[in-house]
Regions:
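A short, flexible loop at the N-terminus of ABC-type nucleotide-binding domains that lies
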Residues: 2-4, 13-27, 77
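ABC ATPase NBD coupling module
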Residues: 18, 72-86, 94, 116-117, ...
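The feature captures the beta-strand-to-loop junction immediately N-terminal to the Walker
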Residues: 41-43
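Helix-to-loop junction immediately C-terminal to a conserved catalytic motif
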Residues: 56
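Conserved ABC transporter NBD signature motif
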Residues: 64-72, 234
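H-loop/switch region of ABC-family ATPase nucleotide-binding domains
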Residues: 209-210
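Conserved beta-strand-loop-alpha-helix hinge in the C-terminal portion
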Residues: 229-253
Length: 267
């Protein structure tokens, strides 16, 4: 299968030339195939958030290139990338305007990447599309389009942002620890919805998580970052049978360092 996303020799340094210089990504290479659902794990400072911000366009690269569907995107702004790359953030209130209704938020998401102007209101054909998309969640939001999102629970907001992110059928979906701020029961609910929706639509997805059990249970591929490089990359049948112990062994074998599971949970 052809690569949808290619990262070539990505370097990123913060505060270069100072005593606080931090070389976060060190020649990172990654090939992502269309339809991959990749979990990205690693301890604090491994480069996970930096990688997400580079993909979304919030950070530029110092060296290297990013190719999406064969075209370089490294010089594109966040707005220009937004049509092809959608992102769901860690905190339920991010990515949603809490004083706007569900349908108003979805209308904004539907026009992501477009210039603001006339025709940004909610149309009847939009409502039909929104209801169809929300039905997939099976949590009743399709009947609450005119409810302000400030009255939704954290889990409902994250489920909504997941649907909003995918309204324009992005080439790439970025999930930035989108269950981390939820209680365990709600986190599991959102994860189950995520797996169901991503698999149904075959969206190419990268998700950051600190939960090794989620990383092992969900998705078709798992990569682990350490000191700015990918040290573990597991997919296919190997991923299906992977255990936490296997993962820790692979990390030690490839990095030369020992790892305890708490380092990822706390990282």
């Amino acid at each position: 299968m052809a690569s949808l996303l290619t990262l070539e020799n990505i370097h990123k340094t913060f505060e270069a030339g100072t005593v606080n210089e931090n070389h976060v990504l060190k020649g990172l290479d990654l090939e992502v195939e269309e339809g991959d659902f990749i979990y990205v794990i690693g301890g604090n400072g491994a480069g996970k958030s930096t990688l997400m911000n580079i993909l979304a366009g919030n950070l530029s690269v110092d060296e290297g290139d990013l190719l999406l569907a064969g075209k370089s995107i490294k010089n594109l702004s966040v707005r220009k990338r937004a049509k092809d790359i959608a992102r769901v953030f860690q905190y339920p209130k991010m990515g949603i305007a809490s004083r706007l209704t569900i349908e108003e938020n979805m209308a904004i998401a539907l026009r992501r990447g477009q210039k603001r102007g006339l025709g940004w209101g909610v149309k009847e054909k939009d409502r039909i599309q929104f209801q169809e998309a929300l039905k997939e969640l099976n949590i009743g939001l399709e009947n609450r389009l005119k409810v302000d999102t400030q009255y939704l629970s954290g889990g409902q907001r994250q489920a909504l942002t997941l649907v909003m992110a995918a309204l324009v059928k992005p080439k790439l979906l970025l999930l930035d620890e989108h269950t981390a701020a939820l209680d365990p029961k709600t986190s599991q609910m959102v994860m189950d919805l995520t797996q169901k929706i991503v698999e149904h639509h075959q969206w190419t997805t990268l998700m950051i998580t600190h939960d090794m059990n989620h990383a092992i249970e969900y998705g078709n591929r798992l990569i682990m970052l350490y000191q700015g490089k990918i040290v573990v990359d597991v997919k296919g049948e190997e991923k299906k049978h992977l255990t936490v112990e296997d993962l820790m062994h692979l990390f030690q074998k490839n990095s030369g360092q020992s790892l305890v599971s708490d380092e990822l949970v706390l990282g």
